[in-house]
Amino acid sequence: TREELTSILYDMLAKMDDSEIFIYWQVTRGTGIRQHQFPAAGTKANLWIFMKPGKHGDSSKRLKLTDMEDTRFLHCNIKTLNLLPNVMAAEKAESMGCGECVFHRGDVVTECAHSNVSIIKDGVFKTHPTDHYILPGITRMHLVQICKDNGIPVDETPFTMEELMDADEVIVSSSTKFCAPACEMN
């Protein structure tokens, strides 16, 4: 239950010596025989938790970006272990001295290898809609809400690479980067 998970996380946090902790947790449907169906009803879920000392991303550090065609399957909104395209894109970015790789399908920007990407143009916060082409990030969700709460117009429609290049600001967001501004592309 939510209460049990909360209790477990607080118990683990109490064992950490740092005041700022990065927490990552996953719940699976449980352990079962290798097959393509879900485990039998009543199978106990597995919980995996990773914690380490860590601070929010440094928003004063501006990222260099690169891009590549998004060839991932059509269910990017589902968190899976099928991350090879993301890993290869992150490696490409790293080898080019970039902090992230922007995925696009044709000319339409989707997201980054392990972050969401949004733009600001003429005072409007624009971000890809939460459809099957992106993993809807928690930080992205909070950014949208903060903009709405502060009267900043939000446009959740697809945008193009040309719009990205012409943006007043490009924001890369994730749980680890928080909100990192981008300064350079390719």
What are these regions (language model features)?
Residues 3-15, 28, 33-186:
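Helix-start/capping segments and mature chain N-termini
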Residues 22-27:
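ATP-grasp fold ATP-binding core
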